[in-house]
Design a protein with these regions (language model features):
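Structural signature of nuclease core domains in nucleic-acid processing machines
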Residues: 1-186
Length: 186
C-alpha cells in the first residue's frame, strides 16, 4: 500500500548518515543491508524502496545541503512536536491528507479557544543561523501544485512549531517528492 511504501522510505531516510553517505544507488543498498542485518530495518520494507530514488535525493541540491548540515551536526530528523494554536485557525485533519498530523480533538483534547496540533517533522537543518524545513513524500502525484495544495497547511503548522520551539526563523520550506525525483519549494 501507499502508506507502507511511505513508511519504508521514511524509516530508511531516518537512519542514513547524510554526512558520509555517497549519493549512489550501491551506497544506499549497502546501508540498507547493514540496517537489515542489525535488525533496525526489514527486508520487507526495503522491497518497497527504490534505492536509486534515494540516491537521487541525496545528490540533489537539497540533499547536498542536508549533508553539509549533517557534517556540522545541524541536521535533525523525525522530530515530534506539539503546537498550540487558536481554534479559529485550525483545519480538519481530513483536509491535511497526512497521518503524521492530528488535531487535538483526535489526539490530546481541546479548549474553547486553543487546540493542540501534534506531528513529526521529517527533517530540518540549520543553515546560516536559520532553519530549512523539509518533508519527504512518496505520493504518486505528478504536478508540483498538487503537492503544494495537499501539504501546504501541514507544513505551515510544522513551520510554526519549529519557530516556536527554536526561536529561529524558518527561511525555506521544501517537499522532496520521490515520485517526481525533485524538491518542491513551498
Amino acid at each position: 500500500s501507499g502508506a507502507l511504501r511511505g513508511d519504508a522510505y521514511h524509516h530508511l531516510m531516518e537512519r542514513l548518515d547524510f554526512g558520509t553517505m555517497k549519493p549512489e544507488t550501491g551506497a544506499v543498498q549497502q546501508a540498507a543491508e547493514q540496517y537489515i542485518a542489525a535488525g533496525v530495518y526489514t527486508a520487507e520494507e526495503y522491497a518497497l524502496v527504490e534505492p536509486a530514488d534515494i540516491a537521487k535525493m541525496l545528490g540533489s541540491p537539497l540533499g547536498r545541503r542536508m549533508a553539509a548540515a549533517a557534517g556540522q551536526g545541524l541536521l535533525y530528523r523525525e522530530q515530534p512536536f506539539v503546537l498550540g494554536i487558536p481554534v479559529a485557525s485550525t483545519v480538519s485533519s481530513e483536509s491535511l491528507h497526512g497521518k503524521a498530523l492530528r488535531t487535538t480533538q483526535e489526539a490530546v483534547g481541546s479548549t474553547d479557544e486553543w487546540t493542540m496540533v501534534q506531528g513529526i517533522i521529517d527533517a530540518f537543518f540549520y543553515e546560516d543561523g536559520e532553519i530549512v524545513l523539509m518533508d519527504y513524500k512518496t505520493d504518486r502525484l505528478y504536478r508540483e501544485e498538487d503537492f503544494r495544495e495537499r501539504y501546504g497547511i501541514q507544513l505551515e503548522y510544522y513551520r510554526r512549531a519549529l519557530e516556536q520551539i527554536t526561536g529561529k526563523q524558518v527561511k525555506e520550506t521544501w517537499i522532496y517528492s520521490f515520485t517526481l525525483g525533485r524538491a518542491i519549494r513551498l
